[in-house]
């Protein structure tokens, strides 16, 4: 869980923290937290939060933020996207990891370990991606929390899965079996260049909202797909076998750990293309 705040590590990685997390969910304190962060009472948090997380306000289109939510949903001057259609672009700012998908694969995301079946709640769909590639993009508080489409094509239905506490995946400590899977939304993207791609947005903590702007309609490369609300988040992209080749220099860098990328940056190529 490198890069997470001390409070996040406390909630996810310690027995008292996991018990506190369970209590927050049981008492609906998360709703009060959301109401506070969306109100003007949260305005004193804006300056310290921006400074602590190195948020570059010079990039934002709006300068006057009335609430913490306003700061988190800030928009910025449109980025320069890679324009070559056969180049896979990153849908967001974040820290990239890449994994081969095997039948027994599990992925560490937001303090939980997910199999593809856990992630999608659809065993038949998950099976289609065995042998393929999973890209994980972890967004930090300083990152831009809007995300875009990776290619032209057609977007299917949004499938929302509420987060739950349950006894399937341990967060850290077997002695205190408190478990958590974050709320998430997955969509099948029928892309023109990279085959059918499953994109999943995963909310953070108990206040991380996911807003997708459309479904069941054509999509355009670089067009905004949606955004996260109030807390750092993660996006995963699932590709079937042979549908992408990571850039060689990126593949080399990933051997040392996560790699920071920007929305619109070229990260992989369609097969048969240079």
Model-derived features: where do they sit?
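Contiguous, well-folded functional domains in the mature portion of proteins
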Residues: 1-274
């Amino acid at each position: 869980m490198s890069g997470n705040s001390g409070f996040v590590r406390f909630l996810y990685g310690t027995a008292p923290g996991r018990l506190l997390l369970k209590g927050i969910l049981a008492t609906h304190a998360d709703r009060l937290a959301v109401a506070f962060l969306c109100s003007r009472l949260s305005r004193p948090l804006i300056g310290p939060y921006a400074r602590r997380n190195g948020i570059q306000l010079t990039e934002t289109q709006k300068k006057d933020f009335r609430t913490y939510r306003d700061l988190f949903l800030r928009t910025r001057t449109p980025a320069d996207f890679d324009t070559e259609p056969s180049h896979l672009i990153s849908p967001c700012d974040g820290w990239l990891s890449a994994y081969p998908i095997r039948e027994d694969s599990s992925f560490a995301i937001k303090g939980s370990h997910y199999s593809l079946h856990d992630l999608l709640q659809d065993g038949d769909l998950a099976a289609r991606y065995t042998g393929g590639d999973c890209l994980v993009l972890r967004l930090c508080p300083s990152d831009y929390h809007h995300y875009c489409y990776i290619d032209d094509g057609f977007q299917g239905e949004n499938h929302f899965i509420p987060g739950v506490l349950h006894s399937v995946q341990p967060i850290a400590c077997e002695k205190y079996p408190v478990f958590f899977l974050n709320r998430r939304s997955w969509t099948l993207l029928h892309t023109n260049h990279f085959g059918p791609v499953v994109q999943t947005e995963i909310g953070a903590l108990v206040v991380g909202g996911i807003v997708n702007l459309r479904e069941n309609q054509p999509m355009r490369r670089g067009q905004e797909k949606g955004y996260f609300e109030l807390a750092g988040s993660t996006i995963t992209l699932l590709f079937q076998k042979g549908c992408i080749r990571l850039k060689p220099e990126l593949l080399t860098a990933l051997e040392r750990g996560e790699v920071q990328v920007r929305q619109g940056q070229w990260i992989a190529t369609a097969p048969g293309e240079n």
